[in-house]
Amino acid sequence: MEKNCNSVAGHAGTLVKASSRQADDKAGSRVPPGGHLLQTNKTESQLLPCASPSDPVHWTNEIVPVVADTSAPAEAAPDQTVSDGEQLTRAPDETYYQRSESLAEPPAENELPAGRSRRRRSRWCLGCGCFEQVKTVVLRMLMTGFEKYAGVVYDHPWLFIMVSLLATAGMSVGIFLRTPESDVYTLYSLSGSPSQVTKEHLLDVLPPDRLLFVLLTGTSNLVTRETVTRIDSLLQGIESITLRRDSVTTDEFNHRLVSHDRSPFPETITFQDICAKDGSGKCQVQSILDLYPSSSAWGVMPIASASWPVVTNPVTHKVSRLDAILGKITTSVRLAEQGSGRPALTVVEEAEAMLMRIDLRGETIWKPYTAAFEKLVLDYVLGQDFGPDISVTAKAERSSYDELKRVSTLDVVEWLRLCAAVLVVFLYTSVVNSSKTHRTKLVPSAMGALASLLGYLGGAGLVYLCGVRHTTPAEATPFLAIGIGVDDLFVIINAYSLTYLHPNPKERVVDAIRDAGLSITITTLTNVITFIIGALSPYYSISMFCIITAGALTWGYVLCLTFFLAGLSLDARREARKEPLSYSLFWRFMPRCCRKSSYEPQLSPPLPLTAAASGLEEMRNESEEIVTADQTPPTHGGDLLTTYQLAALMVLYKKHTCQSRSSQPARRLFDRRDGTGTEETMSTPVPEDSERDRTNQKSCGTQVSTGIVDVRETGQDAASQRRLSSHIRDMTTQESIMLLKNFEKEMEQNPEKLLKLYHPEPLGNPGRGSRRFFRDYYGRFLGNTFVKATVLVIFAAVTALAIYGATTLKFGLSLKNITPQASYLRDFYSLHEDLFPSYGDEVTVFFAENDRWEDREVQMRYLQMVKELSEQEWAVVVTDGMSLFLQHAMPSLHSGNRKEFLALLKTWLEGDPIGQNFSTFFKFSFDNLIVWQFRYWMPHRDNTTTLYYWLKEGKDIVSAGKPYFHGEVHTALAVIWESDPKILPFTLTNLSIALVCILAISLLLIPDLTSAIIVVLVVSLVDLWLFGFMALIDLPLSMISMVNLLISIGYSVDFTIHVAHTFTHCVGASRKDRMVETMIVMGAPVTHGMLSTLLSILALAGSPKYILEVFFKMMFMVIVFAYTAGMVLLPVVLTLLGPFHPHGKRESGKAIACDSSAQLIDMEPLHGTGKEEHGVGV
């Protein structure tokens, strides 16, 4: 291939030999449209378009020389830009060559050029050689597909915009038709868990009652006649509530009743129909009224207990516990009176809280009507006004469902938060991608932010239309979709900004998508795979959330490649016409008579030759020729320089500039004549120390401003600029080809030669300032030895702190926490825990097996089990009718006589005043005991893991009675507690699967094993930090925080993959240089993606919803930790341990860039004008 290029170059030199003398008089050269410019001041030579040194040359068209008019006067290039203190000069072109119609194919292994050794198979994988070949083919196919697709979108932008908007509008209907799932046990329990099986068994044999509580609290004593009277009035109001049977059409979860037979129920359902009855046939209502024998004693007769806290009503014989009815009690003790026989009494003096408990029917067939009746009772109770000194709150079985349903719906505040997030992201993307020139990307940025929002509406809407129910965690989906979606916007605009060297707008868009399409596909795929793995979670709420979010991200990706890409195409046309944005958006559509001014693109006057030759910064001018937006784009040839080589040149130029400034005295350049020459005078030399200080403070860190500048501070810049311009003029075609072929070897041996290839980046190009910042400041800062040591020490301390925190991590999800802060239910939970600490969760122990209770040994074993259970600190109150019966009747019972046992038991439950309190605990058939139960209460605890282990201990005690009896233990929240000990294994398993899957995909970008291992370690560190700091901020590990840990994998891999992949392909002479090059290429997109996501997540700050609060805290830590790991820790580690192959062993030439790549100079003729289009850049 080298011979081919050399022969063609020699032929081109012969063709233009006649015009060489005229070229010597010109300060610069105009770039020929068919190739890449590199020329000499002796011979006007043309660098032909050719593939990289590793590719063969395939000429599809003959070379047609076009000789320019040599008599034309010298003029500056129409497109002159200045960056980093350089000035590029051009002269009219001499020849033009057509480029190949297709990408050059790589040579076969046996057709490698002379001197090129075959690529050795990697040591760590025997099949890596084959894998690399397959990967190369697949990547080329994907990039070619993106290239062709982008061309279609560019040709039909309005079609793609309208189709995408119409499709999104149709899909977004599902947002408004979604069905929320509010069953807390369905949302946050494990399907098929042991507790779930026990619950279903209990519902079949002995359905528990539905409990309704009314809690009154005051600032003073409530045990007064007035308060008791008002409680009686409240109870009478509840008993007077009625419910129309036909008005009930849905259940408590808002699911429509299908095939429901209403005939067994009365048309008007009253409280007597809906309440659960006790042994005497009365409704089971427990209140302070049960403590008085009659209404005349209300608030007058003292409430006293001989065996605290149990008290028995002397008239009704109803047994009550005072500490379960009254809260914040003040008592006094009355000593026993020997003469009257009155025992010692504990008397209630004051109580500041009262609790009323109402039992409602729990049968499955009655549930729809019971739930509807509960809603009426809640509305009535919460609407009562007891005055300023008494507050009322309540809790029903359906309360948690109602409140979860309320928080599962986007209210006005949430819509405002969402709009604020969209607005903030829109403003941020617009600011960072805007400039004062025609290159501003304000409109594409706005369309990109809008595309991320439309992605949520369309993707989530389609998922809802498919039958997926909306869950509470899905409230965070729109914020995540917006934050993650705009990342693709920054990557594409960054790739587009690096294609400014193309004269044709269509080619710019095509090349940007060809280079960035694979990158955004990989990152989107990693995020979607993360959520797909989360969708396999056994938790219903998390599974639905992951499905909804995956759909939103997928559709956002589609809109990015349709809606946003079409907008970028339209804006690229405008940029090619050099139209100001205001003209395109506003003045163009006004009548000519009303226009502010007629816009006619004007060419800027050419620069004087002397200014171009001297390279003075103050003579900077940005003038370009107008390009027809719809002209036929040129076909693609091989890239001469990849993005990584361009970044290496930027670093090399900066080092060269700093060295030249510190080693040479200042020069004053001033044109004393008529613009045809310059005169240089030497100023007083600057001391080395002061010059070095000025270099560190200004020259090596800041951009030289335009305009008239102090030559005492910029004279050295002019010298280096003039020297670089001279290098460019003196470079021959043969030398340029050899430099490009041996780029990496020259980087190691003769780096100053490569400065001849360095070209400036135009002003106003999006991301230009960010790239300069990461090169001049951030990269140099991280490369400092002291800074690297400090970073490692800080992250070691953070890791140690995280390890400590991980050892104190708590688990579980409290029902109180997922309740909205402004909810009456949350107030009830808080007050009940404070005023009634011993009465937390009610536990039911039931026996549904046909055990031999008539046997004496079984009875003794049972009494022993109850005694052991009662002695536990977590079994505060044990209410057991069977124990009381056995203590009462055991002396008269004969072992083994079942008929006698059942008869005495029935008699005790029906006739004994004490036994009547337990009659509803037993269920008989005609001649047998079917099932019976007893209850105990556990104290309140915030740690649900502790409650789970208490329940487990209770199960173990009951299970120890086998084979004498078979009992089962159940409490309502057990199905949620049971997930606590399993949440950590589930989390670690999902994290491992996600990490393996994502790294498998990432190997497409990082073939180096060392880099892959570093990525694994860094991502693992991020997860470790999250585990530790969750404990430090008192955030338990639950199913909600678990999904954030999965998200952290995606974020961490995105950041680290971008950095590690770029570092692997950089070509700097040292690890430090490659780290700086990595920051130049990926620093801005990664940083902007992080900040946009962070801004969208900030909209969740201060949300009253616990789940959104958890998402905000977790996502904030995820973003901060992932970014600092990828942009601070990883670059430092790579400078120490990163892959560093000697240039002689690396494959020179073109490297397939999966993120972004740019051509150094890429030209094509301007059809119909006879002029050429020029571009330079980095």
UniProtKB/Swiss-Prot annotation:
Gene Ontology, cellular component aspect: membrane
Catalytic activity from the UniProt record: cholesterol(in) = cholesterol(out)
Glycosylation sites: N41, N433, N621, N917, N943
Disruption phenotype: Gene knockout results in higher growth rates. Accumulation of numerous lipid bodies in the cytoplasm. Accumulation of several species of cholesteryl esters, with the greatest increase in cholesteryl linoleate, arachidonate, C20:3 and some very-long-chain polyunsaturated fatty acids. Accumulation of several species of very-long-chain fatty acid sphingolipids. Shift to the endopolygeny replication mode with the generation of more than two daughters from one mother cell. Unusual cell cycle with a long S phase and short G1 phase.
Membrane topology: Multi-pass membrane protein
Membrane-traversing stretches: 157-177, 412-432, 448-468, 478-498, 516-536, 545-565, 789-809, 986-1006, 1013-1033, 1037-1057, 1080-1100, 1114-1134
Subcellular location, principal: membrane
SSD domain sequence ranges: 414-570
Compartment(s): Inner membrane complex
PROSITE patterns for the chain: SSD
Keywords: Glycoprotein, Lipid transport, Membrane, Transmembrane, Transmembrane helix, Transport
Superkingdom in the source lineage: Eukaryota
Function: Likely facilitates the efflux of cholesterol and gangliosides from membranes. Plays a role in the regulation of lipid homeostasis.
Family to which the UniProt record says this protein belongs: Belongs to the patched family.
Record-given protein name: Niemann-Pick type C1-related protein
Source organism of the structure: Toxoplasma gondii (strain ATCC 50611 / Me49)
Gene name as annotated: NCR1
